[in-house]
Amino acid sequence: MLKVKLVRSMIGCNPKQRATIKALGLRKIRQEKSFEDTPIVRGMIKKVEHLVEVSES
């Protein structure tokens, strides 16, 4: 399992990055979600790694 936490604002991000954050289900700063560790989720995290914090649980 991966815990993904939004730590930076989406202000100034391009639309694809905003869509990725939305697809991850993150809306507010400091909001956390848990995901299965799959290549799809890893790819999404890689696209917005400057905005999120990831921990394995």
From Swiss-Prot:
GO terms for cellular component: cytosolic large ribosomal subunit. CDD domains: Ribosomal_L30. One of its GO terms (molecular function) is structural constituent of ribosome. The keyword Ribosomal protein applies. It comes from the Bacteria. Keywords: Ribonucleoprotein, Ribosomal protein. One of its GO terms (biological process) is translation. Belongs to the universal ribosomal protein uL30 family. Part of the 50S ribosomal subunit. HAMAP family: Ribosomal_uL30_B. This is Large ribosomal subunit protein uL30. The lineage of its organism: Bacteria, Pseudomonadati, Thermodesulfobacteriota, Desulfovibrionia, Desulfovibrionales. The gene is rpmD.
